[in-house]
Amino acid sequence: GAVKQFWTDVIWGDVDYMFVDMPPGTGDVPLTVLQSLPVDGVVVVTSPQELVSLIVEKAVRMTEMMPRKVPVLALVENMSYFKCPDCDKVHHIYGESHIEEIAAAHGVDTVCRLPIDPTIARAIDAGEVEKLPCDELAAIAEKLLAL
């Protein structure tokens, strides 16, 4: 299929890290990637909704069931919370997080939470995400680079 063709027909050169952004869940694309590409680990990105947590749990279990178990390097929760810029109060707009429970159940040591932050959206839209002074993003990058 398209995933295998993408992997075999592109001259990748010398690559230290490759991130493959996939649809959530355990469908054909994630299964093909895990079975066909030389995957050393996965970073699972989620959000705090209950249904999403169930899907992520299933996807993490799928990595464990591969003939060559693929380790989950980190769980990253996107849109985890909103911190009011006026009063610093944290609001869990999409509900409470389940990321710690999933991490504990599957032995994932690295857990990161990204806030809902209009500054991040503006930086991405402007093509200037690398200039973004975001402690949460810096912490995630440092954790992943240390793996």
Residue ranges and their predicted role:
Residues 9-13, 35-38, 65-68:
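Conserved catalytic network of the ASCE P-loop NTPase/AAA+ motor domain
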Residues 40-49, 76, 114:
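Conserved phosphate-donor/acceptor-positioning beta-strand/loop module used by diverse small-molecule
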Residues 2-32:
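Switch II (G3) loop of P-loop NTPases
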Residues 64-147:
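C-terminal lobe/tail of nucleotide-utilizing enzymes
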Residues 16, 40, 73:
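Conserved acidic residues
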Residues 31-34, 56-57, 87-88:
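Short amphipathic alpha-helical segments
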Residues 26-41, 50:
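ATP-dependent NMP and nucleoside kinases share a basic, alpha-helical "lid"
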Residues 3-4, 50-57, 96, 134-141:
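Amphipathic alpha-helical transducer elements in NTP-driven molecular machines
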